[in-house]
Amino acid sequence: MRRSSVTNRQSLLPLRVQDANRMGLTTPQNKDRQGFGKLSMSKPHSGTSEKKTSFFGKRASNGTARTSQYGAFGGTEKIKDPRPLHDKAFIQQCIRQLCEFLNENGYSQALTVKSLQGPSTKDFLKIFAFIYTFICPNYENPESKFEEEIPRIFKELGYPFALSKSSMYTVGAPHTWPQIVAALVWLIDCVKLCCVLRSENPVFEDPPMGEQSENGIDFNQLFLDYTVRCYDQFMEGRDTFEEYDTDVCIRLKEAYHVDESNLEALQQESRRLMEEIERLEKEKENEPDRLASMRKLKASLQADIQKYQNYLTEIESHSTLLDQRVSSISEELEATELESRAIQQENLRLKNILDNQKYSVADIERIKYEETELQQTIAKLTKDLDEDKQQLWHEELKYAKMKESVETQLSEFHKIGRKVRLIPPTAEFANGYDFQIQCNLDSEQSSLMHYRNKINVPLVEILSQSEGHIASSTNKKMGVEDMVEQLNTLIGEKKNEVKVQKDEAQKLEEIYQQKVEESEEHEKRWISEIESLEKHRQLLESGVNKSLDEAMKDLQKEQQELQLVEHRTEEEMRQVENKLVRVVHAVANHVAVIEKHLEEKRLKVEREYEEFMKEDLLLDLRELLEKYKEKARVLDSL
């Protein structure tokens, strides 16, 4: 006996007294029965919520609600599929699970989610065989009647929903692929569950009899004693065994050292885990494609990082330019300081001379006047210097704006050149010329006029070539349009012919219907005559018994004539039908011949068009000109 079936088990024998509150011998059917591989996520029930009855009586809930691993066993009614097979998000999730399983387990081909949107029947057979080999390693795809073999395998595995034979022929169709991919995901769940069961220790296996395994013989002896005592009480007429249930529970708890104080903590832990699972499921429902959103966020962040790196590079280059300017300005400042020191020394020397020297009042006045003039000159020069600096600042701003606009125009020029395939030199229309403008606007050697002269000549050459190509293409297009117009005219004529043939067929159909109506009228007339003759026969039988033989003979004659007339009518109808069938076949053949002729004309025109496109147009014109010249010579000679 298995240990998992000891604590709460239904009675193996029927009750003597029928009790509506007790369970019968039928297998209980769970309405929420899930398929194999779907784990039950129902909330755990308290082990003490129901009163225990017989050890084999009502089963007290002591854990999660058990679901069938092999589908529903009771009844053959068709179960409605609760899965949202019409939901695109659900189907895409199933396809991703299938793709991940195949790639992780070494499938022979590298698959993507896009390649699994609508696979062929051959690919489906390979995928099914690869997955099913995890359950049955010796399985091989059947050479024939796979449409019967695969649904049978799913049915044997306990797949709760039916797969039709027709769905095996159109696996990749939009109306059948959701059912197939859901079945494959169910099969993957089966494989995962089998792998888990194989990897686990055989905890629930029956201990071998006769060996001193841990609690093995005690357990078997305990169960056998309980069974014997319950059976004895059952044979005596009892249906409930509460005292034996209580006794065996106590002995089992002692045997397995069950601590009831930990049950509440375990139940709280179980409830916490269930709440955590529900929270994670809600998060998954709210964010079904969180990985894709995180990848997009990662890509945007990487793009921002790249932008910031480019910005830092530009800042570093700008900082380098500023350092160069600072160094040049510092050198100028040092030179200015040296010049200022020299001027100060000169002023000291002159002041010393002035102190040692005696001046007259006129000299002092003259010196003051010269000093005033020099101060005015210095103020004027200082003002001019400030104005020059302000002008230089404005010129630098204009230069920066002009440089920025030139760089924008250069980038736009390069962008347009790549778009029209002129850049790089190896592009389609570059003809080996380098149209890229790579110049440093800060350097004095750069000259846009040099690049303008370098690029202008090849551009003019390419422009002239393009105009020639455009003119030749325009001429070709006009010729093709004329040819298409001729073809449309020919097709219109053929359509008119087909319309005439259809009108003739309709007329023949009307004639046939008229003949059928005439035959029906003849038949009705003969039926009415037969009815009148039958009435006449009845009158003769009731009125005159003597002329019965003569009336019978007359009736036979009339019947023979009727048969002859019916035979003639059938022959006429058969002839009319044969004629009509021949006419319809002739019309259909004629229509088929016309369609074939039109198809040949179309193919011929396409071939001529291809040959026409391959041929040199000027060669045909030259030949035509020569022919006209020859005809003109002949006419002149005449």
From Swiss-Prot:
It holds the Pfam family DUF5595. GO terms for cellular component: kinetochore; Ndc80 complex; nucleus. InterPro entries: DUF5595 (IPR040967), Kinetochore_Ndc80 (IPR005550), Ndc80_CH (IPR055260), Ndc80_sf (IPR038273). Residues 249-394, 479-638 form a coiled coil. The keyword Nucleus applies. Its main location: nucleus. Keywords: Cell cycle, Cell division, Centromere, Chromosome, Coiled coil, Kinetochore, Mitosis, Nucleus. Residues 1-55 are annotated as: Disordered. Disulfide bonds: none annotated. It is found in: Nucleus; Chromosome, Centromere, Kinetochore. Gene3D superfamilies: 6.10.250.1950, Ncd80 complex, Ncd80 subunit. Component of the NDC80 complex, which is composed of ndc80, cdca1, spbc24 and spbc25. The NDC80 complex interacts with mis12 and zwint. Interacts with cep57r. Belongs to the NDC80/HEC1 family. Acts as a component of the essential kinetochore-associated NDC80 complex, which is required for chromosome segregation and spindle checkpoint activity. Required for kinetochore integrity and the organization of stable microtubule binding sites in the outer plate of the kinetochore. The NDC80 complex synergistically enhances the affinity of the SKA1 complex for microtubules and may allow the NDC80 complex to track depolymerizing microtubules. May play a role in chromosome congression and may be essential for the end-on attachment of the kinetochores to spindle microtubules. This is Kinetochore protein NDC80 homolog. The gene is ndc80.
